[in-house]
Amino acid sequence: YILRVFFGIIIQLEWRVLMFLKRIELQGFKSFADKTVIQFDQDITGIVGPNGCGKSNVNDAIRWVLGEQSVKSLRSGTNMSDIIFSGSEYRKPVNMARVTLVFDNSTRVFDSDFDEIEITRQILRANNEASYFINKTPCRLKDINDLVMDTGLGKDSLSIITQGNISSFADAKPEDRRSLFEEAAGVAKYKK
């Protein structure tokens, strides 16, 4: 919400979408063996569907691109390369996982002159090392963290909540809840 105040009196309250995820491209990530593109519009607030259709894997993919380093949090074995599609009865395993998030940046929420921001992470089975990209340019995870810090996004953000995290958020210590709210509000960088 955008709130405009004049001499302590609310003069206008309006809803404005400042940024949204336009699409996610997944290839070789968990159950998404083939390249899959999911388009979103700015009115999407959640992902729903029957059990086993990949909702949690989409959520994991978003968190992974934004820097999640815990294989346990991604529900994937013991090695980060375990997130790579490992084959099935009818499909061979693939050698790489790549996920790209494409954000609308027409309002310049991200500190960039581009109308779209692409954030990509990929991993190769051969060396188990991740590569990161912003708008197809190689970068470090720190660069991605710096880019999203002001937006309320991040691997631990309240922007991305799984079913299991709702109860853990409610049971969290007050200081842990506060830091999540600070990240969601985009003020975490000012505490450093």
Language-model segments: residues:
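Gly/Lys-enriched N-terminal cap/neck module of very large, oligomeric protein machines
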Residues: F20-K192
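Short, Lys/Arg-enriched N-terminal segments with co-localized hydrophobic residues
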Residues: Y1-L18
